[in-house]
Swiss-Prot record:
Name recorded for this polypeptide: DNA integrity scanning protein DisA
GO MF, one example: ATP binding
Residues annotated to bind ATP: 77, 95, 108-112
Gene: disA
The enzyme's E.C. designation: 2.7.7.85
Catalytic activity: 2 ATP = 3',3'-c-di-AMP + 2 diphosphate
Pfam families recorded: DAC (PF02457), DisA-linker (PF10635)
Domain DAC: 10-148
Length: 359
């Protein structure tokens, strides 16, 4: 598998947390060690750098099981697993990292874990004997796994926040859609909706972290998120395609740049203008016209390639609305039936958003 080829040492934080999430054999073994109050040190991955810090121990090379991990953790030394975590390679080893590597930890086990992680780049799992805490180290990163009850509480709070922000976003999008049909959208409206999309996506990403950490316990949270914001990334990407200055093939690149921004950058209009390809001095009250990707995509059973062809042919939503059935029929991939469907679909959306705006 691709993930096994990469090795645990190359995984990002979400993957690392999922690697030891409830429901995995590794987490089951770690929980056994926690309950026994023996503590432990586990290295995931074995390469030349790991070899250079390992001393002693004995070769196991057997399939991983929670019971084996529990028994081997009774000994003082570290346990070394394969990159995939599916094999126990060595047990009762002594780890001797470079003592000059800075460590902010105080306990011997955690100090060793931090130094080995920095020196080797591998995932190191330190199980505290007294505090019943699981700490993950990889490179310069440190992450303490939290109690499942605590994570569930935080996840449910985040779900409630997501619901509120999603409601605000829905109102903003509905108002924007009405303005799009009336050709009254300003750059201020665009930036406002862009902010709201990003806030919803950030909350979703935070909840995804909780879901990964919860493992099998996060199933209901995942269902709630999926029900709340299905296809949110796609809608945000189409919104960007509607308003970016120059046409782009992959709006997800800009969406990723948006999500990588700090909270301060997100509040800076000039940075958002630059992201969309406009001058930083753009007037917030200046009118801007949608291409129509997002609204056309809302018409049932209208494939994205057809949406692309329509926008390519007419340029902006206003011209699409002005086009008659014959004009639409001339677009590649659109026959008379589909042309009528587009006209009726846009008319229905226009009426819906007009009514929503009056409520």
């Amino acid at each position: 598998m691709e993930k096994e080829k990469k090795g645990a040492r190359e995984l990002d934080l979400l993957d690392i947390v999922q690697f030891v999430a409830p429901g995995t054999p590794l987490r089951a073994g770690i929980e056994n060690v926690l309950r026994a109050n023996t503590g432990g040190l586990i290295v995931v991955g074995y390469n030349d750098k790991v070899k250079s810090v390992v001393d002693g121990g004995f070769h196991i090379n057997s399939a991983f099981s929670p019971a084996h991990l529990y028994e081997l953790a009774k000994m003082d030394g570290a346990i070394i697993l394969s990159d995939s975590g599916q094999k126990i390679l060595y047990a009762n080893t002594q780890l001797m990292p470079d003592a000059t590597i800075h460590s902010s930890e105080t306990g011997m086990r955690h100090r060793t874990a931090e130094r080995v992680a920095k020196q080797t780049g591998c995932l190191i799992i330190a199980i505290s004997e007294r505090r019943n805490v699981i700490t993950l180290y990889q490179g310069n990163r440190r992450y303490t796994l939290k109690d499942i009850g605590f994570i569930l509480t935080k996840a449910n709070q985040a779900i409630q926040t997501l619901e509120k922000y999603k409601t605000i976003l829905d109102h903003a999008i509905s108002a924007l859609s009405a303005l799009e049909f009336e050709e009254l959208v300003t750059f201020g409206d665009v930036l406002s909706v862009l902010h709201r999309y990003e806030m919803v996506l950030r909350i979703k990403n935070e909840i995804n972290m909780y879901i990964k950490e919860l493992g099998t316990e996060g199933h209901l949270i995942r269902l709630q998120v999926n029900e709340l914001i299905t296809d949110m990334e796609q809608e945000a990407a189409l919104f960007i395609k509607d308003y970016v200055k120059e046409k782009i093939k992959d709006p997800y690149v800009l969406l990723k740049q948006l999500q990588d921004m700090s909270s301060f950058e997100l509040l800076d209009d000039s940075i958002l203008y630059k992201l969309l390809g406009y001058p930083a001095s753009t007037n917030i009250d200046e009118y801007v016209y949608t291409r129509g990707y997002r609204l056309l995509h809302k018409i049932p059973r209208l494939p994205m390639p057809i949406v692309e062809n329509v926008v390519e042919a007419f340029g902006v939503l206003d011209r699409i609305m002005e086009a008659d059935v014959q004009d639409l029929d001339e677009v590649e991939g659109i026959g008379e039936v589909r042309a009528k469907k587009i006209k009726k679909g846009l008319k229905r959306l226009q009426e819906k958003h007009y009514i929503d705006r009056q409520l």
